[in-house]
Structure formats: C-alpha cells, structure tokens
C-alpha cells in the first residue's frame, strides 16, 4: 500500500513541477520575444531619443513584472517543497506503521503455529483416550459375559418352578434342623437332669418307662420352648429388606407365620445362610405346613404389588433406610 501511495505522490509532484516549469519557460520566452521586438536596433544605434526613453520605461515595467513572476515561482517552489516534505513524513509514518503491522503479523503467525501444534497434540491425546476407552469397553463386555451366567441364574431363581423348588428346600432344611435340635436338646437335658430316676428302674418293663418319662419330656419341652422364644426375641439378624420391583419372595415358616418380603436377588444366598444359622424353636406339636406357591394374577394384584414395593422403597429411604427382619 505505501509503495502505491509513494508512486502516486511522486507522479503528482512531477506533474506539478513540470507544469510550473513549463509556465516559467513560456513566460521567459514571451518576455524575451517582446524585448527583441521592441529593441531590434539597440545594438546598432547607441544614440538615445525621447522615443527610446519611453521604451526604457516600458522595459523597466516589464522587468518588474518579471521579478514578480519570479517571486511567484519561488513561492510556488517553496510550497511544493513543503508539500514534498509533508509527503515524505507521511510516507515515513506509513512505513513505520507497516513495519509494526508486519511485526504483529509475525507474532500472530508464531501464535498460530503454536496453536496448531497444541491442536495436533490434543488430537493425538484424544485418539489415545478413545483407544483406551475402547479397550476398557471390550474388557467390560468380556467381564459381563463371564458374569452373565451367574447374574441370570440369580435373577431367574425366583421365577416359576425354580422358586417353588427353593422354597421347598428351605422348608425341608428348617424342619429337619428344628427336629434334630429339639431331639438332641431333650436327650441331653433328660440325661443331665434325671440320672437317678432313670437308673432307679433298671429292670422295669417298657410300659413303666414310657409312663415315667412322658411327663418329664412334656415339662422339658415346655421349658425349652419358652427359653427358645426368649432367646429368639433377643437375637438380631443381619438380613435387611431391600426393595426390588422385579422379583419377590413369599416365605412361609414352620409355626404358621406368613411373611412376604421384597428381597434383592443378590441377597438370597446370604438370606439362606442366615436362616440356617438362626436358633431353632421346638414346637409344642410339630406340624408340617405345606402351602402352594401362588402367583398374583390380574391388574388389581399387580397394582397392589407395585404400591407395596413403592411404599417399602420410600420407607427404606426416608424412614430407617434399612429394616431388619426380626420375626421368622
């Protein structure tokens, strides 16, 4: 840009100088021709007359006009010089500005190069992160495929016939262990509490032994039952009720208590272990209660199960967050 402006300034200055110079030359030529025409024989006739005096006056006036013209030329030249100096100063300022702008452009270019390098580095980092994420996804899918069998088994245990089989096994285990524990406790207490009475009749008949032992067994059964109830009320469990909207377990116990809990499928193994480790209660009259495993059908039952599960979930969150199973 500044080169174009300098060319324009030079062209304008040259045009002004040429026009003024041509005018000066033309004016000088005109003055010379006038003088030559007025004094054609001045060199030949040195004598002066009155007419010659008048011509000299005219020549003096013309010389004055020439001096005025020359002064005008000088003033125009001075103006041209001042204009040229102003143009040169403007050109120098323009050149300084262009240099400053070039420096700024160089700084911007360096910054752009740095930003491009940073962008390349970030792009490489992003690609590496994507590769790591893909590798992690593959590992997660592999682990999920490995654990899918166990998870599906835990979720499907409570559906249909498998749920019935598990409940029947629970009933059998609890009933068999209660009977064994009651018999062992009764035998141990009979042997420890009444050794003399049993040994006092070594040669009696079977009929007499049944008559003497039966009231003792009944009394011991009652006392053991009361002690077991007291110890059971003091015992605490480590199993909690967890809301689960997909699966539910219906538990029927030996002594007639019917409880329905919404347990998570992952806690089923822990729940079974807890059941096996609980203290047993000797019943007054052992009875095997068999109940059928029934599934709720119909829209009303579905609504009731959903409402109960939602209430249980809200109660667990805002009430106590964990509710212990204290009665079985």
UniProtKB/Swiss-Prot annotation:
The modification Phosphothreonine is found at residue 182. It comes from the Eukaryota. Residues 93-148 form a coiled coil. The keyword Metal-binding does not apply. InterPro entries: Ccdc54. The keyword Coiled coil applies. Keywords: Coiled coil, Phosphoprotein. PANTHER family: COILED-COIL DOMAIN-CONTAINING PROTEIN 54. This is Coiled-coil domain-containing protein 54. It comes from Bos taurus.
């Amino acid at each position: 840009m500044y080169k174009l402006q300098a060319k324009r300034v030079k062209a304008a200055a040259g045009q002004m100088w040429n026009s003024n110079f041509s005018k000066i030359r033309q004016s000088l030529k005109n003055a010379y021709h006038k003088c030559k025409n007025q004094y054609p024989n001045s060199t030949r006739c040195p004598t002066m007359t009155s007419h010659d005096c008048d011509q000299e006056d005219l020549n003096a006036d013309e010389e004055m006009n020439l001096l005025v013209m020359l002064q005008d030329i000088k003033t125009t030249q001075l103006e041209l010089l001042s204009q040229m100096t102003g143009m040169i100063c403007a050109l120098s300022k323009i050149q300084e500005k262009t240099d400053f702008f070039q420096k700024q452009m160089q700084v911007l270019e360096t910054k752009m190069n740095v930003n491009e390098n940073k962008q390349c580095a970030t792009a490489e980092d992003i690609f590496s992160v994507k590769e790591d994420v893909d590798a992690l996804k593959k590992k997660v899918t592999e682990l999920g495929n490995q654990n899918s069998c166990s998870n599906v088994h835990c979720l499907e245990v409570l559906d249909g016939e498998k749920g019935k089989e598990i409940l029947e096994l629970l009933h059998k285990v609890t009933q068999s262990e209660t009977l064994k524990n009651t018999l062992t406790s009764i035998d141990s207490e009979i042997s420890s509490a009444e050794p003399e009475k049993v040994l006092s009749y070594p040669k009696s008949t079977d009929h007499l032994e049944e008559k003497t032992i039966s009231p003792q067994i009944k009394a011991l059964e009652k006392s053991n039952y009361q002690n077991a109830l007291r110890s059971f009320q003091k015992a605490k469990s480590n199993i909690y009720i967890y809301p689960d909207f997909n699966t539910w377990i219906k538990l029927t116990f030996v002594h007639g208590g019917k409880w329905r809990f919404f347990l998570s499928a992952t806690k089923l193994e822990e729940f079974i272990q807890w059941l096996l480790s609980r203290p047993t209660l000797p019943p007054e009259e052992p009875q095997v209660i068999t109940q059928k495993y029934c599934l709720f059908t119909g829209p009303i039952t579905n609504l009731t199960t959903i409402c109960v599960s939602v209430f249980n979930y809200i109660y667990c969150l805002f009430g106590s967050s964990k509710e212990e199973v204290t009665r079985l």
